């Protein structure tokens, strides 16, 4: 057989699907169409999202636009709070927590609305003629290019469908091709779950058009209007209108479809835009050369995605469909699946959170319902923050910007919530939405939490630690100061220890077990609150010093910080969740809020607070592993910070537990790799990506720690592009047999690079001399000091057991690279 014929056979096999794309490890691929939404593949460009089902006969593209939310501009504070607050506090301090909780609901929770729902636009349907049976089916999502492909053979003809949500063009673009001319025939139409205020029509330009209005909700009028347009460019064949809402293509050689969605949203206070005009503006990019539009899309996407790569090795598992690999992950070694899942989290963040747009919500931007689970809001007691945990470390700082903008806007609206308590500054409670509402919602069981402003501010400060950008810090410092002013007014002295505490509050979504019974959530001075307020004060003092703020303000913060409740170790060696030693070792609640100081905070460390480190480990062990999907993602981060890579890896196997459940506490991963609470919540995807990063590199505790929590199963690998605090970029790190071999670090802003590693190091071939653990002189690489913890008299204590490490200081210059190795370079 000639070489020419061999090449032709190979090409035919690739086209027919007999050889799948195993050469590219960054693909989710399947051998059957999606039947459920959680099997469809997500595309997004930050503004619009699409779920691709891949059905040969009846293709569907479920559509979202980031600003299609119910309701309209408003806030939802309760003016009765001022009068009720002193009484609620008195009841708490008298031990009458149930009575305080009963009063909190009507007195402080919103009496108007509990937040607005994120809503779908609808679905574009393509119904194809003559495709009743098919063979050689294959569909994939290439997360290296952000393109979804479906391929199959029917009636001896090979069909290929490509789809992508163009980043530069802001459109969904779909390309249909066939191996035989005149083989593409279909009808196209929209559907939507809205039952009112919708219109299906054919535009004067022969486009499908869907006009709609988002719903009223809880008495708040829905004022978001949207228009979806689909333009069909057929090469060969005919395009005609077959009804007032359907277009038909007959006998085309190829077809390109362009989907544009516009709304009247201007900002959280203004919905005076023109939805049709916006959709038309985006549609101006349609009709241009497809290959060039595709190349431009890939280039725009890869400027972010290609910054980081992870190679953990591969094996024959890559030859199996992704859903099967998920089913087998806990029992079969599949290092490349872990790398794929890590990168899938980065893919989702790029696709759901673009500069200038909205922050990723509970479902990112993907939702097929009129009322997404938990309304798809920005739940602030962990979920929206978790969405952005991988932003800075995995080199997606630009993707962080929509969340930082949300913080800026909430800080404005939140003045009303602070005033509700007769306080200066700003705050919000456990949820917000596109309208930046800041009131307490969902009743006393969930709404009693005014502390998330401190968590929001942690993101502001942490971003500065990665960049050292003082212009940025000057921009966000007033927000941090405003949050501090709220606590200077809101903190109250509890009578037992005379500590300053947050009251009323709760440990998110958990309730203490008092005398074996659970009867209330509302308390004073939870550990999480104490950790976050301390973190806010400490960070703001550092920022104020950099901003040359007057010392009277920073002195007041330090004075109050000295009177905050310290962390406590309880009777069974646990880190207490509440001020009282109420923790139940049988409590397996999904939230582990008292471990905030371990992750994402930086107050608990093996090297600087070993007693608390062991107490946190005791608490986390008792909480258990399997839980909701997002909880397991958090636990990956926590076990990485506990320097236990094998346990962190166990949590990854738990999170990659297959499920198709839509409700319950049995979390895992859906066939399309979406995280399952269940139902779908995107935060677990981001949490696990952040946790995997922490297994390779940590920089929160005063040094850039290389391979702090490497599991035995990943004995060799290469990671590139991870960002560290201090303005350092880990350009590449290689390891073999569980030991680092080389690491190249670029200093983007100069200053001292402190390295912690498990092996002696050489710099450019010269042996380095270790230094003492005393803090280095780089202000961006400092451990966070804490108050001395209180330890119960009967608490069992142990000393952390961890591998010996070496600490090195390297003076760096801006833009220079430093190559570290564990042996002289000439060996």
Regions found by a protein language model. Name each.
Residues 1-23:
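Bacterial Sec-dependent N-terminal signal peptides
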Residues 22-444, 451, 460-464, 481-484, ...:
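Aromatic-residue-lined binding/catalytic grooves and analogous aromatic/hydrophobic interfacial grooves
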Residues 363-364, 368, 500-502, 510, ...:
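C-terminal catalytic domain of Rieske-type non-heme iron oxygenases
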Residues 383, 449-463, 472-489, 631-632, ...:
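Extended, hydrophobic alpha-helical segments in both membrane/secreted and soluble proteins
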Residues 454-458, 478, 598, 614, ...:
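Feature representing long, continuous alpha-helical segments
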Residues 464, 488, 493, 503-518, ...:
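Aromatic- and carboxylate-enriched substrate-binding clefts and catalytic-loop regions
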Residues 508-525, 669-680, 714-717:
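Short beta-alpha connecting loops at secondary-structure transitions
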Residues 675, 682, 696, 701-724:
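Acidic, turn-prone loop/beta-hairpin segments
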């Amino acid at each position: 057989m000639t070489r020419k014929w061999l090449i032709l056979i190979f090409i035919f096999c690739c086209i027919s699907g007999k050889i799948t794309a195993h050469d590219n490890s960054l693909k989710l691929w399947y051998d059957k169409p999606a039947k459920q939404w959680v099997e469809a593949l997500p595309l997004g460009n930050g503004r619009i999202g699409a779920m691709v089902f891949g059905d040969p006969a009846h293709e569907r593209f479920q559509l979202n636009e980031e600003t299609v939310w119910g309701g309209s501009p408003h806030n939802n504070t309760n003016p009765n709070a001022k009068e009720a607050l002193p009484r609620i506090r008195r009841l708490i301090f008298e031990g009458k927590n149930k009575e305080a909780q009963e009063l909190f609901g009507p007195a402080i929770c919103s009496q108007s609305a509990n937040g607005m729902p994120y809503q779908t636009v609808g679905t574009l349907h393509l119904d194809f003629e003559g495709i009743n049976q098919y063979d050689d089916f294959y569909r994939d999502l290439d997360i290296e290019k952000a393109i979804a492909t479906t391929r199959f053979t029917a009636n001896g003809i090979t069909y290929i469908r490509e789809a992508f949500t163009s980043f530069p063009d802001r459109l969904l673009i779909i390309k249909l091709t066939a191996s035989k001319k005149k083989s593409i025939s279909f009808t196209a139409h929209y559907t939507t779950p809205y039952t009112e205020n919708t219109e299906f029509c054919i535009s004067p330009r022969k486009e499908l058009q869907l006009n709609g209005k988002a719903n009223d909700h809880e008495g708040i009028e829905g004022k978001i209007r949207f228009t979806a347009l689909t333009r069909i460019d057929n090469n060969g064949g005919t395009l005609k209108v077959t009804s007032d809402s359907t277009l038909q293509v007959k006998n085309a050689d190829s077809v390109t479809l362009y989907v544009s969605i516009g709304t009247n949203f201007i900002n959280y206070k203004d919905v005076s835009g023109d939805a049709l005009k916006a959709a038309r503006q985006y549609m101006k990019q349609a009709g241009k050369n497809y290959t060039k539009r595709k190349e431009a899309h890939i280039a725009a996407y890869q400027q972010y995605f290609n910054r980081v790569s992870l190679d953990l090795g591969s094996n024959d598992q890559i030859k199996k469909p992704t859903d099967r690999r998920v089913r087998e992950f806990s029992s079969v070694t599949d290092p490349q699946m872990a790398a794929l899942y890590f990168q899938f989290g980065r893919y989702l963040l790029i696709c759901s959170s673009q500069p200038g747009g909205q922050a990723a919500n509970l479902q990112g931007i993907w939702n097929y319902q009129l009322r997404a689970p938990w309304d798809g809001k920005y739940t602030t007691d962990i979920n929206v923050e978790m969405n952005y945990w991988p932003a800075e470390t995995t080199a997606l700082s630009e993707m962080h910007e929509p969340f930082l903008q949300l913080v800026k806007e909430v800080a404005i609206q939140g003045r009303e919530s602070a005033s509700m308590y007769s306080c200066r500054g700003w705050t919000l409670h456990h949820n917000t939405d596109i309208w930046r509402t800041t009131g307490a919602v969902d009743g006393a069981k969930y709404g009693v939490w005014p502390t998330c402003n401190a968590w929001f501010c942690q993101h502001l400060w942490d971003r500065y630690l990665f960049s050292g950008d003082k212009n940025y810090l000057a921009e966000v410092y007033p927000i941090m100061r405003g949050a501090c002013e709220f606590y200077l007014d809101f903190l109250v002295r509890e009578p037992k220890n005379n500590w300053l505490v947050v009251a009323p509050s709760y440990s998110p979504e958990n309730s203490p077990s008092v005398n074996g019974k659970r009867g209330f959530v509302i308390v004073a001075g939870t550990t999480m609150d104490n950790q976050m307020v301390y973190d806010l004060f400490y960070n703001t003092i550092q920022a104020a010093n950099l901003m040359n703020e007057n010392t009277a303000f920073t002195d007041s913060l330090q004075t109050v910080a000295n009177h905050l409740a310290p962390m406590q170790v309880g009777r069974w060696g646990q880190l207490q969740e509440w001020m009282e030693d109420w923790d139940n070792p049988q409590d397996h609640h999904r939230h582990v809020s008292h471990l905030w100081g371990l992750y994402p905070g930086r107050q608990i460390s093996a090297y600087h607070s070993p007693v608390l480190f062991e107490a946190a480990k005791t608490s986390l062990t008792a909480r258990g592993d399997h839980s909701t999907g997002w909880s397991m993602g958090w636990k990956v981060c926590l076990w990485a910070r506990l320097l236990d890579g094998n346990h962190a890896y166990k949590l990854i196997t738990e999170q990659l537990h297959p499920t198709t459940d839509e409700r319950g506490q049995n979390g895992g991963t859906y066939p399309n790799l979406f995280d399952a609470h269940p139902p779908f919540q995107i935060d677990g995807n981001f949490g696990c990506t952040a946790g995997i990063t922490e297994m390779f590199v940590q920089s929160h505790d005063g040094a850039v720690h290389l391979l702090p929590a490497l599991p035995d199963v990943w004995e060799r690998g290469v990671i590139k592009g991870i960002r560290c605090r201090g303005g350092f970029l880990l350009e590449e790190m290689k390891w073999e047999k569980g030991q680092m071999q080389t690491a190249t670090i670029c200093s983007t802003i100069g200053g001292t690079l402190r390295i912690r590693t498990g092996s002696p190091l050489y710099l450019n071939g010269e042996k380095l001399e270790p230094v003492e653990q005393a803090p280095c002189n780089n202000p961006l690489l400092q451990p966070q000091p804490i108050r001395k913890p209180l330890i119960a008299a009967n608490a069992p204590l142990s000393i952390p057991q961890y591998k010996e490490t070496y600490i090195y200081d390297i003076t760096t210059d801006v833009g220079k690279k430093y190559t570290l190795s564990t042996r002289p370079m000439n060996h």
